Every structure is written in C-alpha cells, then in structure tokens.
C-alpha cells in the first residue's frame, strides 16, 4: 500500500522537499546518460530555490531524444559531467 503525506505526521505545508526532473539519452536505465537536471525546493507552497543545468552524458544523444527534449549534442558538449554536477545539486 502506498503511503500518503498524512502518514508523515507533519502537515504538508510544514514539509520542505525538492522536486527533481531529469532528461536522459534514452529509456532503459542501464543504457542512458543524464542530459539535464532541474530541481525546485519547496516549503509551504513557496519556492525556496531552483537549480538547472545541462549535463554532458559522455555519449551521443539519439535524434528521437533531441526531437522530444530539444537538447542537442552541441548543447551538452561544453556542459559539465554528472560527477561535477551532483555535489552542486546536493548543496
């Protein structure tokens, strides 16, 4: 059974949380690289901060993914690798 926010014992308005969105090079977890990370930190319905960066996946972006996301190989080529991005995201 899936738990609800009521199960936390804290009203949702008092909970600080982050919503994270990833764009990747494909659909299978073992064969993909991250091309973009976006995050929003929220508390009580207020935005406390945002984070967004392109990520160099170290692999080619298939044309179908470029059509879907608008992210091209040229856009991610100068971007940092995921190893460099994660510490900044976790701050």
What are these model-derived regions, one by one?
Residues 1-91:
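Conserved non-catalytic scaffold segment of RNase H-like nuclease domains
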């Amino acid at each position: 059974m899936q738990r609800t926010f009521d199960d936390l014992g804290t009203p949702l308005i008092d909970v600080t949380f982050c919503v994270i969105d990833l764009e990747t090079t494909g659909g299978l977890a073992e064969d993909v690289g991250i091309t973009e990370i976006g995050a929003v930190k929220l508390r009580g319905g207020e935005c406390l901060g945002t984070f967004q960066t392109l990520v160099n996946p170290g692999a080619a972006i298939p044309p179908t993914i470029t059509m879907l996301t608008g992210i091209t190989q040229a856009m991610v080529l100068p971007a940092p690798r995921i190893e460099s991005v994660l510490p900044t995201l976790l701050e």
